[in-house]
Amino acid sequence: MRNRYIEHFEKAQLEQKSVPEFKAGDTVRVAVEIKEGDKTRIQNFEGVCIAIRGEGTGKTFTVRKIGANNIGVERIFPLYSDSIKDIKVVRRGRVRRSKLYYLRERKGKAARIKELR
């Protein structure tokens, strides 16, 4: 049983930030604010969402992209983090699983996801 004060606080936090609806298989572009010394900049990370887990303010999602030299890069983002400035759904994917960890072993065309019609 969760504390009702924590639930009330989380409910207020969830209402403050609007997050687009997306699920595993969708290609998303996440704009992350990065602080280097006294400077801040926004870095985009675009890839396929392979997992969404947790609930409430602790909800996280994992994005995987293929970087330079065909090396896979995965980042786990807290959904309601203050460092995330924007999440944009680039395209919707058609998958039959909620966790797409099998994409880690796939290379090239085998790692593609069909587009939702």
From Swiss-Prot:
Alphabetical GO CC annotations of the entry are:
cytosolic large ribosomal subunit
The leader peptide range reads none
Q: Name one GO molecular function term.
A: structural constituent of ribosome
GO BP, sorted A to Z = translation
One matching Pfam family: Ribosomal_L19
> Which UniProt keywords are present, listed alphabetically?
Ribonucleoprotein, Ribosomal protein
List the HAMAP family hit by this protein, alphabetically. Answer: Ribosomal_bL19
Its job: This protein is located at the 30S-50S ribosomal subunit interface and may play a role in the structure and function of the aminoacyl-tRNA binding site.
Q: What is the protein's given name?
A: Large ribosomal subunit protein bL19
Species this chain originates from: Nitratiruptor sp. (strain SB155-2)
